[in-house]
Amino acid sequence: MRVLAIGATGFIGRHVLRLLADDRHDVAVLHRGETAPNLQEGICDIRGNRDQLAECREEIQRFGPEVILDLIVYTERQARELVNAFRGSGGRIVAVSSADVYRNYDGFRGNATAPPDPTPLSENAPLRQTRYPYRGHDLPFAYAHDYEKILVEELLLGDPRLPATVLRLPAVYGPEDKQHRLQPYLQHMSGDGIPIFLEKGQASWRWTRGFVENVAAALALVVKDPRSAGHVYNVGDEPTFTEREWVERIAGVAGWEGEIVEVPRDELPEDTRQPVDWRYDLWTDTTALRTELGYAPPVPLDEALRRTVRWERSEPDGTD
């Protein structure tokens, strides 16, 4: 199978490339060349800007992709250009989306338009009624103003001439995670035994997470399986822990034996209170991916945490 991967040189993408190349698929990567991708032998390197696909159309056509995997389609304009570039080509799109499309995400961020939806959230759960969730926020992300995965999904799934699959990703963690999702707790665990304080609502809040190699395995599976066309799948590791359980798991791997204390919000120092509503879980149901396509995460939880903790502690500003 010939696979064109757009923006696959980073945190998640490099693992997807390895899996596809190891399975002897013909793989090409479209990227701007701003990072050193260290591509495996045999992977075709196409330099170009995903915002200007027309400029590298000839090179893409020579490669002749059967599947286009887009890990960095963030905006309506990008999705429309993707559809226009590949509509009628005989190819199939696999696009990365996010669990931030669900209505509970609005509630979690304090913009509730409805009571919390029941969890775990299936792929058919209500979506946000607001749009552009990061517009107006000071974020180090070039597409924050126009970011909207709901519009991306609608465009990609709405054209019968271009089969598409959408994968809604969880909070992804692991080595090379630029967001350092484990670091705040690990930093505390490297201290002098002061308890970790969790707001009461936070302690019972659930957020689906996924180890980077497990998420990559899900992407590679969908790329290889044409049965996925026309479907939306939630991705994530099981089970989805409460925040307290998650901290306890990290502590077990990190060797920390300190205390986790649940406190009312008004007893927390004001500068540590997070501007969120913990009643709105971001817990997604990943049953469909497992039952319909036979997905099974390759890396167990404890091993995933061990690798991540080891990497965090090896960083120059690590948490030893």
Give the location of each predicted region.
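Substrate-binding strand-loop-helix patch
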Residues: 176-177, 204-214, 232-253, 282, ...
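Conserved C-terminal active-site "lid" loop/helix of NAD(P)H-dependent oxidoreductases
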Residues: 212, 268-296, 317
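NAD(P)-dependent short-chain dehydrogenase/reductase
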Residues: 159-207, 250
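Mid/C-terminal beta-alpha module of Rossmann-like enzyme folds, strongest
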Residues: 218-280
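N-terminal Rossmann NAD(P)H-binding glycine-rich loop of SDR-like oxidoreductase domains
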Residues: 3-23
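Alpha-helical substrate-binding/gating segment
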Residues: 186-197, 205-241
